[in-house]
Swiss-Prot record:
This is Alcohol dehydrogenase. Homodimer. Keywords: NAD, Oxidoreductase. It comes from the Eukaryota. SUPFAM superfamilies: NAD(P)-binding Rossmann-fold domains. Belongs to the short-chain dehydrogenases/reductases (SDR) family. GO terms for cellular component: cytoplasm. Its EC number is 1.1.1.1. NAD(+) binds at residues 10-33.
Amino acid sequence: MFIAGKNIIFVAGLGGIGLETSREIVKSGPKNLVILDRAPNPAAIAELQALNPKVTVSFYLYDVTVPQSETVKLLKTIFAKLKTIDLLINGAGILDDHQIERTIAVNFTGTVNTTTAIMEFWDKRKGGPGGVVANICSVTGFNSIYQVPVYSASKAAALSFTSSIAKLATITGVTVYSINPGITDTTLVHKFNSWLDVEPHVAEKLLAFPTQTSLACAKNFVKAIEANKNGAIWKLDLGRLDEIEWTKHWDSGI
């Protein structure tokens, strides 16, 4: 099993899907779970620690929109304490097409910067041991919710980035895969803004269709982590875990 005995960093591990997944990860017995999030939640950290006292759960304040140099600085602190990190989960995300710059900064640039920052410690060309990255993207990276085109585009960009660097694993020693949840019943989807208010009732319309619980999503998330398949595009929708076969329409040839 991949999770057991490992050191894991979970960016945004206290959110809706994030906290539920953190619970499932802790139950699977990692050595350390390090949660990076924008807001402290001591009660949640205590709950996670109590779920499995053999796991050390720690917390650091972190905003994915900080300069990459700040991320490297924080990672140096974590690596100095734990010596090794086996898995980085990038889970930060917002859904609000009124906030164009922040949506891109959190959903795409933040994922890129955090992934790039940890390469300083993992890249085998620098003598690093390699590692694994799991990036939470979205099914909107496959087909957009057209009323929130900024959100959908940011997730498509994160998916493209993830799939690209997975192909560099033989060079960097770092394997990568994407986690793409379908509509999950969290606070994120209950109230959000469409682009230019083209659909004021977008949340209500979206929730009129079947959704999945955050627990169902989290359980499948852990299954994907345990599968540990480089380049996998995982769809986590309506309680199912499916690997997506990406259709190639063009190839650079290099």
